[in-house]
Every structure is written in C-alpha cells, then in structure tokens.
Amino acid sequence: MENKYTHGVLFYHEHSGLKNINQGIGEVTTALSSICKHLSIQLSENEGDIIKYCQEIKTKNYAKDVDILFILGGDGTVNELINGVMTHDLQLPIGILPGGTFNDFTKTLNIAPNHKQASEQMISAQVGKYDVIKINNQYALNFVGLGLIVQNAENVQDGSKDIFGKLSYIGSTVKTLLNPTQFNYQLSIDDKTYSGETTMILTANGPFIGGSRIPLTDLSPQDGELNTFIFNEQSFSILNDIFKKRDSMNWNEITQGIEHIPGKKISLTTDPAMKVDIDGEISLETPIDIEVIPNAIQLLTVNDL
C-alpha cells in the first residue's frame, strides 16, 4: 500500500481511559504506520503539552514534514488537540482514535468505538471539514453546557454515576442524585435576546451528547450554525423523552419544555456565575461569548455505508 502521508504524529496521554495504554498504542500503530512513511508516537505527560507540541509543529521545531495528526484518547484529550490546532492555525488533518469514557464526535465521523478498529478505518477514511465552536479564547468540537450537565460532569469526576452516559438513570434517579440548581440567564443569539430562569443550557455543534443523539435530523457540524437548547421544565423526565426518541421524531412533538434556537454568535450571562462544561472539561465560568467558525478543522471521516 502506498503511504498517504509523509509524517504522522500520534498523541496520547498515559492516563487515557484505556486499561493498558501501551498495549493500545501497539494495537493502533500497525494500521497507522501503513499510511505514514514516518510515524512519531508522542506522550502528553501534562495538561497543555499537546498545545505546546502543536506550536512546535507550526514553527517546524518539532519536525519539518508533519502532515497529519492522530490522537488516542477521550473527549478531554481530543479537546486539547483541537485547541492546539486552532490556536496555532495548523492546517493539518486529524484522525481521532477513541480511548476514553466518551467519544461523542467519533460517532459523528462514523468511527468505531474500539481504538484498534478505528485505526484500521483510518486507512480508507476521507478528510472532511467541520465547524468549530469558539468559547472566549477556547475551542471545542461538540458542545458547551451549564447547569445540570456540569453537575453531571462533576459527579463523574467524583466517581459517581454518569447520568447522561447511562440514560436509564435519567428521570427517576436524577432527582435523588442531583438537586438541579435554578439560575437566571440573559442570552443573546444573533442579536436576539432571551432571558429567564432555567436549570440547564446547552449549545451543540455535533449531534451526539453523552453517547446519545439529539433528535434533530438537520443538526450538523458542517452547516455553519450552532444549536442552543434552553431547558425550561423542572421535570427531568423530559430528558428521558428527548434522548430516547428516534431521529424521525419531530422536535415539537416531543416537548414544549425545551426551547431550541439556532444561531452563529451567542453571548451568555448568568446570575449567579455558573461553571461551563466544554466537551466534558470544566474550565470556564459565565459570562461567555460563543461563536461558530465554519469549516475550521479537517477530520478523518469514515464514509457512511
């Protein structure tokens, strides 16, 4: 097989979700080395390392011939690479290999959940261009959320149940595991303003959150638009309804308890200030400014058969 790329760099974190990261590295390099003349394997020891390596690749200090990047890890590790590529304007394709708790965006790319299978898919995968979310000075592929979704992420970090990941818990157990905090919000989306009280706001680029598809057939990370959802109902059985419906369901048939607002530029303030979940990483607080950057990143995509 002819090598597609000259020099690929495979990033990984030793605290990846894989039980044996070294074994995982070995399992993916067979396929990756078949499409790269030269494959570098780069450990990220500390948070922020991948962003530094992206800077070195941009300035050619890492190597002069890097023409593709791979990442083995969960959404948090992928998020760091996305930030490195966007911050340093690396016009390079990225191949994502699942290796963590969730890899929501790999579902969008039709990539297998198993890292070894995913690496084999990279051989025939095609490069697609995707929108990126900019949040203040950070970047994300999939979503920005606050309220209940942040409480959920903090529960996961504490080793508790992942409500969004285990949908059977939504509705009944959510009230016992979490006491959703009401907060006031002021939202501006493409110069239209919205305000009120809620327990959760989500802005989505991709169609999957927590492993489940948002039932909007036209939600796409390639349409130059973001989708904001305001959860107006206090009853969280509504979440169960949303995530269990099929794609063919009309949004308005499901519930009147969630407001859906598409848009490109978003400003959000809350009272009190709220923590913000960006693709599973909690690193900001409100107020925040959000915008979509169309066709900003190149990702290896498996053709949907």
Swiss-Prot record:
Location of the active site: 281 (proton acceptor)
One Pfam family named in its UniProt record: DAGK_cat
Cofactor note: Binds 1 Mg(2+) ion per subunit. This ion appears to have a structural role and is required for catalytic activity.
Entries under Gene3D superfamilies matching the protein: 2.60.200.40, Probable inorganic polyphosphate/atp-NAD kinase, domain 1
Entry-linked InterPro entries: ATP-NAD_kinase_N, Diacylglycerol/lipid_kinase, Diacylglycerol_kinase_cat_dom, Lipid_Phosphate_FormReg, NAD/diacylglycerol_kinase_sf, YegS/DAGK_C
Keywords (A to Z) from UniProt: ATP-binding, Kinase, Lipid biosynthesis, Lipid metabolism, Magnesium, Metal-binding, Nucleotide-binding, Phospholipid biosynthesis, Phospholipid metabolism, Transferase
Domain of life: Bacteria
EC number: 2.7.1.-
GO cellular component: plasma membrane
Protein name (database record): Putative lipid kinase SAS0691
Lineage: Bacteria, Bacillati, Bacillota, Bacilli, Bacillales
